[in-house]
């Protein structure tokens, strides 16, 4: 792969294409269920395309990423005056590129290899709409993350109450591209107020979707012994705002039109 395809659909496997067409009943509209906040699914991205995409990212973007490193503030301990009065702001370490910042070197590199166009494509928006089971606004945020050995994101909820468009929730869709040197990295999320749910996200082409806000964290990436320098997990990320309340129709209409097609234009 010399460039990313113009359409996200061209990365998908047959199962992924079925989601896009509204024919995968288990996944289409899954996040319209008010009891469900998160889904993780493998096999939706073609394995060969996933490997090629990861190699392309290594060559084109790795050198241009920005490091995000927000450690736990020491005053969370030194300023404590009462027993059991702990507080923990979001702590994290990873590398990233915000692709909307077009003057940045990473954004320019992403544009040159077609990544920005693919993440802004109609089919990526339609794929997200199919999982959400509801209308999404057409313009969405795009970002790339890269976790190396030991990189993580601590407990956080991604709630943005000061932003009117996102205050009542929004959708994140992540495409995971882990190298063979990665042993594991887990996503842990809260259910009924407790961190009881866990899934390994160190996949090559796995898809995760988040109906935010909810509490979750990403564990430190663990490399296979002796392969720390080669252990990376890329994440292609889209952030989508809701365009309308959820529809009761999350499955294909009687005429066969998939939800993704009906709601792709907000």
Language-model segments: what does each one mean?
Residues 2-125:
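Non-heme Fe(II)/2-oxoglutarate
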Residues 68-188, 213:
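Conserved double-stranded beta-helix
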């Amino acid at each position: 792969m010399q460039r990313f395809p113009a359409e996200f659909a061209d990365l998908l496997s047959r199962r992924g294409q079925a989601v896009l067409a509204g024919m995968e009943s288990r996944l289409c509209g899954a996040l319209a269920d008010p009891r469900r906040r998160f889904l993780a699914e493998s096999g939706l991205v073609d394995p060969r395309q996933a490997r090629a995409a990861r190699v392309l990212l290594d060559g084109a973007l790795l050198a241009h990423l920005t490091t995000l490193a927000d450690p736990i503030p020491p005053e969370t301990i030194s300023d404590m005056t009462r027993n059991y009065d702990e507080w923990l702001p979001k702590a994290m370490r990873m590398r990233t590129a915000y692709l909307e910042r077009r003057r940045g070197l990473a954004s320019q590199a992403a544009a040159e290899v077609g990544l920005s166009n693919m993440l802004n494509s109609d089919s990526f928006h339609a794929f997200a709409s199919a999982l959400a089971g509801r209308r999404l606004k057409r313009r969405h945020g795009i970002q790339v993350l890269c976790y190396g050995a030991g990189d993580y994101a601590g407990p956080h909820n991604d709630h943005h109450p000061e932003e009117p468009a996102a205050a009542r929730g929004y959708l994140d869709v992540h495409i995971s591209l882990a190298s063979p040197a990665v042993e594991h990295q887990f996503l842990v999320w809260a259910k009924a107020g407790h961190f009881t749910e866990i899934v390994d996200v160190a996949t090559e082409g796995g898809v995760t979707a988040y109906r935010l806000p909810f509490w979750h964290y990403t564990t430190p990436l663990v490399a296979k012994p002796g392969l720390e320098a080669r252990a990376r997990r890329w994440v292609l990320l889209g952030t989508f705002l809701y365009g309308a309340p959820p529809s009761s129709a999350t499955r294909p209409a009687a005429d066969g039109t998939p939800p993704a097609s009906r709601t792709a234009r907000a």
